[in-house]
């Protein structure tokens, strides 16, 4: 049984943890999890406990975690990422440190955990507070998942003294099946799959995953990928995040990556219907004031057909419960704004 080491006595996280432990020990072969809903409506699915245990062993073995190491639970337990932190603790004998899920997971922690799994937003926020940044630097094994790690965040982590990893996975793979190092001499833009995982590209150029330890089915993802001769891969974007504007295909993630260094506020690229172009590239941004030179700034870094035809200031960029940009909500919001 997990024995939580809890720095702050918040009953809601305790109740959620106990509910999951009760479900885990109820004698049934599966537990329920919820997908993030980043590309559409969140879905509920049942996953096998034995495969969650297999996933936990893959991660703990890869990272070299030891029995008795502390593991920080700082993500909601309705999603696979939070559940897998608990399962790793159960399977590997880790000491679970529980905090209320928030944008500042280290705010109430006195001592850095040995192992922590966070989303990019939590890492970014922690870097902004000196005390939290120092604790983050002391985490011996930090994995970051649930969203892309942009170049600026990767640069901020590059000189960390301990291992920092970006993970690749999804609910269907029970958290991650591949990692890439973000700091030190091993830093790379290529993900390395676990030894038991096989990957290839579909005819669409999307990543196909064969990971029998965590899913009995071969999974074809919507992630457009590139493979190298070492069996590694990198993600170029999602097939459903491609905008076809006047016959030119624009990958949303690539456009956002070029804009990120020059836009110091939250933003998202999407598309709205256009009579002439089919789809028009559209930018939503959450700045405190209007940005009259925004289009020119975009033109300075984007090819002509990638540049937004519309820019709309919004109160906030819609996100899912796990902190990802909610692409479906962003697109719907842009369509409403375009209609006036």
Q: Model segments located where?
A:
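Conserved pre-ATP/AMP-binding loop-to-beta segment of ANL
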Residues: 15-34, 67-70
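Conserved AMP-binding A3 loop
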Residues: 30-57, 64-66
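Active-site glycine-centered loops adjacent to acidic/histidine catalytic or metal-binding residues
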Residues: 38, 119, 146, 169, ...
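AMP-binding/adenylate-forming
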Residues: 47-54, 70-125
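Gly/Ser/Thr-rich phosphate-binding loop
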Residues: 129-184
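AMP-binding/adenylate-forming core of the ANL superfamily
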Residues: 198-220, 224-226, 232, 286
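AMP-binding/adenylate-forming catalytic core of the ANL superfamily
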Residues: 224-306
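Conserved C-terminal "lid"/linker of ANL adenylate-forming enzymes
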Residues: 282-284, 297-340
């Amino acid at each position: 049984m997990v024995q939580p080491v809890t720095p702050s006595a918040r009953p809601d996280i305790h109740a959620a943890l106990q509910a999951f432990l009760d479900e885990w020990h109820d004698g049934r072969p599966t537990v329920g999890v919820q997908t993030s809903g980043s590309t559409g409506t969140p879905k509920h699915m049942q996953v096998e406990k034995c495969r969650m245990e297999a996933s936990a062993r893959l991660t703990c073995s890869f990272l070299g975690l030891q029995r008795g190491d502390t593991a920080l639970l700082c993500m909601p337990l309705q999603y696979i990422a939070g559940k897998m932190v608990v399962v790793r603790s159960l399977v590997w004998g880790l000491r679970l440190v529980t905090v209320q899920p928030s944008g500042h997971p280290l705010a109430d922690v006195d001592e850095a955990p040995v192992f922590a799994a966070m989303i990019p937003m939590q890492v970014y926020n922690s870097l902004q507070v000196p005390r939290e940044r120092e604790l983050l630097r002391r985490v011996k094994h930090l994995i970051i998942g649930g969203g892309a790690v942009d170049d600026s965040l990767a640069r901020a982590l590059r000189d960390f003294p301990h291992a920092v990893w970006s993970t690749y996975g999804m609910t269907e793979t029970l958290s991650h099946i591949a990692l890439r190092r973000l700091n030190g001499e091993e830093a790379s833009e290529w993900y390395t799959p676990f030894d038991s995982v096989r990957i290839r590209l579909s005819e669409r150029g999307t990543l196909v995953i064969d990971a029998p330890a965590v899913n009995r089915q071969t999974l074809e993802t919507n992630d457009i990928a590139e493979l190298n001769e070492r069996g590694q891969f990198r993600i170029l974007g999602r097939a459903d995040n491609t905008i076809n504007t006047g016959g030119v295909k624009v990958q949303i993630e690539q456009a956002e990556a070029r804009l990120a260094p020059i836009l110091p506020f939250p933003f998202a690229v999407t598309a709205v219907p256009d009579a002439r172009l089919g789809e028009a590239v559209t930018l939503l941004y959450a700045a405190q004031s209007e940005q009259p030179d925004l289009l020119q700034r975009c033109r300075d870094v984007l090819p002509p057909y990638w540049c937004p035809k519309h820019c709309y200031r919004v109160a906030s960029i819609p996100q899912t419960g796990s902190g990802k940009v909610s692409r479906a909500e962003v697109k719907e919001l842009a369509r409403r704004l375009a209609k006036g």
